[in-house]
Amino acid sequence: MIDTLFFLFFLFFDSPLRRLLLLCAVLALRAPTAHSPILRSSIVTPTARAVSEVSGCTTIDPDFLVEISDSNQTRAMSKARVYTEVNVIRPKDYWDYESLIVQWGEQDDYEVVRKVGRGKYSEVFEGINVNSKEKCIIKILKPVKKKKIRREIKILQNLCGGPNIVKLLDVVRDQHSKTPSLIFEYVNSTDFKVLYPTLTDYDIRYYIYELLKALDFCHSQGIMHRDVKPHNVMIDHELRKLRLIDWGLAEFYHPGKEYNVRVASRYFKGPELLVDLQDYDYSLDMWSLGCMFAGMIFRKEPFFYGHDNQDQLVKIAKVLGTDELNAYLNKYQLELDPQLEALVGRHSRKPWSKFINADNQHLVSPEAIDFLDKLLRYDHQDRLTAKEAMAHAYFAQVRAAETSRMRSQ
């Protein structure tokens, strides 16, 4: 049938471009269904995919959406429950980072003092502003695509002044190598592996609440962080100051856009990333926050300790159960590859009480368990939003203290 249609249409389509587009569509229909090593899902034909690849994002034109699945049904796009249209309403120059013209500062204004860390995309140093003598953080970027650098700068500029968002002070580059560096405010943080075991029940409530302020703000500005983890949450415990840092993987949220699932650090990857669901949203950050919170209250870091991405899903399934995982997959018309399905196996849901012991019981209250349970959900649509999380009973003491403090000022 397809061959006959192809022959007839080829006779009538005299334009080479039209013939090429038709050929792509027919070949896609004739080809055997291609499967990811992890997941079998709906396949979108090449004609449906807009020619727009921005840092792993693919825009799908709904007017040309053709999906082929085992059930021959089209899966509706998943959209964020909150702040869905932020970047639809705002002018293009708010989120169009590829058009950003960087205003470079003077590199000679800053001197490196000592190395404080390194990541996949950068090396981080404590520095000093030679003019003001103030400490700063210098993030020297490794060679990456210019649009990725522009994206991080644009996002930091848009979030400037937001609660508990690290402040970008300057952007400079070496005159010879053209290597760019981002200059940030200095935060005198303690390594989380040293700090977390010393935190009280109230400390954890306080710092998670402060982190939620940062997340709700960035989400309200149409931005997903996509790499929430202890390494990226700087805490100056003496000043009780928290800053959410490293916005290198952050991205603007556009409803209907498919995003790269190769984001976030393994132990904090949401199930949506592990099953290759690309139309994820801000709720990814809430899963990562939940993993971080579980590690803090149960004193088990990391909480889900997978050896690779497939094993990460196995570790999650052993806690949340496979019946719930299958319900999630069915809802979004996804299917695990047989190899991964075999690895995951069958597991019943484990009650959170199983993780309570003599060392952590003083941190695990009923409201803490309820809060955690509403974050660590397979279905990203069922997780608390950052604003909903801030209203949870777990933070009643923190909200009361904040209200009292504001009244006394």
UniProtKB/Swiss-Prot annotation:
Entry coiled-coil feature ranges: none
Enzyme Commission (EC) number: 2.7.11.1
Keyword set includes ATP-binding: yes
UniProt note on regulation of activity: Inhibited by heparin.
Function of the protein: Casein kinases are operationally defined by their preferential utilization of acidic proteins such as caseins as substrates. Phosphorylates casein in vitro. The alpha chain contains the catalytic site. The tetrameric holoenzyme CK2, composed of two alpha and two beta subunits, phosphorylates the transcription factor GBFl, resulting in stimulation of its DNA binding activity. CK2 phosphorylates the transcription factor PIF1 after an exposure to light, resulting in a proteasome-dependent degradation of PIF1 and promotion of photomorphogenesis. CK2 phosphorylates translation initiation factors.
Protein name, UniProt field: Casein kinase II subunit alpha-1
Domain Protein kinase: 110-395
Cell compartments where the protein resides: Nucleus; Nucleus, Nucleolus
Record-level GO BP terms: regulation of circadian rhythm
Species of provenance: Arabidopsis thaliana (Mouse-ear cress)
InterPro entries in the cross-refs: CK2_alpha, Kinase-like_dom_sf, Prot_kinase_dom, Protein_kinase_ATP_BS, Ser/Thr_kinase_AS
Encoding gene, per UniProt annotation: CKA1
